[in-house]
Amino acid sequence: MTTFVDRVVLHLQAGDGGHGCVSVHREKFKPFGGPDGGNGGHGGSVSLVVDPQVHTLLDFHFRPHVKAANGRGGAGSNRDGANGANLVLKVPNGTVVQSGDGTVLADLVGVGTTFEVARGGRGGRGNASLANARRKAPGFAELGEPGDQIDVVLELKSVADVGLVGYPSAGKSSLISVISAAKPKIADYPFTTLVPNLGVVRVDNHTFTVADVPGLIPGAATGKGLGLEFLRHIERCAVLLHVVDTAALETERDPVADIDAIEAELVAYGGLVDRPRLVALNKVDVPDGRDLAEIVRPDLEARGFRVFEVSAATRAGLKELMYAMGELVTAARAAAPPAEPTRIVIRPKAVDDAGFTVEAAPGGTWVVRGTRPERWVRQTNFDNEEAVGYLADRLARLGVEEKLGKAGAQAGDLVRIGEREFDWQPTLYTEFVPGVRGGDQRLAEKSERPSATERLAARKARRQRPEDEAEADEPVGDGEE
């Protein structure tokens, strides 16, 4: 069974927010206790964090579906629901987070680096939080907002200073095993190395990391062999070391041709041309290997390569090679821009942008896009007339109706906000009219809704009624005595 996985697809689902509660306080001798519905809890978010003890994406290979906890719903007596627990996933250093279309969302380098991939939904407000001077006992509450749902691709790019490249069976694994404490699998057949191996090299004041990747063959940059899958592991390397087999049995191969073939693959892959190179002519302990190394060395040096004749078996020439790698790594680190100190700034969550746009769509439909309008629609219970009326008030105060009118929308046009569609009625007056709890008189049938004249007459009748009752209570006399 494989123990190394460097690419997985994750299906992430953040927690949904809990619904707000509709409740009215009931207690003896308190006939008007008022609303006491609590707010729903926020859903849990999904984050990635770099852990130094994790070296592979194997866990996600077997569990690709991840979901955070939902927020709990509110309850009466002003009891707020509990927030859903945030889910933190541990990933190796050097993990790249990409969206489904290949867009890089984050490059996680450095222990403790954290990235929030999916944010939990906001909890809905209970009717106690929605009460105001005019709407003293709301008969509705907000729904919890759904959490983010996203598919991401995680790719591991090993974080190493020196990358060992070369043909299969060139001796890369043997070399890394003697210059570091790494224990890769070593055998006398090609493609023994199937996963990258990392080792830490210490020589005097130099300490650096070396990566041994599977052997490359012509066409690796286009997918042949194992090169395409593992070439990304040397993208972060500051130095590349060509490991060349001087004792190869294939008569048609020679060290110069091997280096030319590997260089062609590195150029085809892209992004590796500017890295400094070293050449290690390996297996010079073999007589034929020593003779071949002496023949090709002048040609390689004429091309600008620093060449070292080494033997992983006898450890000949390894000291000079490690010093050269350490010097190049130190120079690369000095040339790199200084890392800015990390400042931890605690800020509240950003307030939703109040901006929105109104666009005409085919078929006489108008589309309203904006953070606030879309969130308000998601949190509205459309089975409750009073909640729908509250949504109409909020959209009107935000200026949605005014902007629709200026854009040319007509009564009865279809308006889409988020995933909901509405028939626009600009004549609906936007003032809360108290009525039955859970209802809104503005949404009643037109024949049932009293006109302004009828409402004025009703108010006059209510004022006149106490005067009529007072006159009826006056005693009636029998005349003069």
UniProtKB/Swiss-Prot annotation:
Q: Give positions of region: Disordered.
A: 439-481
For the protein in the UniProt heading, the enzyme class is hydrolase
Keyword annotations from UniProtKB, A to Z:
Cytoplasm, GTP-binding, Hydrolase, Magnesium, Metal-binding, Nucleotide-binding
Q: Where is the composition biased (Acidic residues)?
A: 468-481
- SUPFAM superfamilies, A to Z: Obg GTP-binding protein C-terminal domain, Obg GTP-binding protein N-terminal domain, P-loop containing nucleoside triphosphate hydrolases
Please tell me where GTP binds in this chain.
166-173, 191-195, 212-215, 282-285, 311-313
Cite the GO molecular-function annotations of the record: GTP binding; GTPase activity; magnesium ion binding
Q: Any idea where the Obg domain is?
A: 2-159
Superkingdom to which the source organism belongs: Bacteria
- Give the enzyme's EC designation: 3.6.5.-
Subcellular location per the Swiss-Prot or TrEMBL entry: Cytoplasm
GO CC list = cytoplasm
Q: Where is the composition biased (Basic and acidic residues)?
A: 439-452
Q: Which InterPro entries match?
A: G_OBG, GTP-bd, GTP-bd_Obg/CgtA, GTP-bd_prot_GTP1/OBG_C_sf, GTP1-OBG_CS, GTP1_OBG_dom, GTP1_OBG_dom_sf, OBG_GTPase
- What range(s) does the OBG-type G domain occupy? 160-330
Biological process (GO) annotations held by this record are:
ribosome biogenesis
Q: Name one Pfam family in it.
A: DUF1967
- Cofactors per UniProt? Mg(2+)
What PROSITE patterns has UniProt attached to this entry? G_OBG (PS51710), GTP1_OBG (PS00905), OBG (PS51883), OCT (PS51881)
How it assembles, according to the record, is: Monomer.
Q: What does this protein do?
A: An essential GTPase which binds GTP, GDP and possibly (p)ppGpp with moderate affinity, with high nucleotide exchange rates and a fairly low GTP hydrolysis rate. Plays a role in control of the cell cycle, stress response, ribosome biogenesis and in those bacteria that undergo differentiation, in morphogenesis control.
* Name of the molecule in the record: GTPase Obg
Record organism: Salinispora tropica (strain ATCC BAA-916 / DSM 44818 / JCM 13857 / NBRC 105044 / CNB-440)
Classification from the root reads:
Bacteria, Bacillati, Actinomycetota, Actinomycetes, Micromonosporales
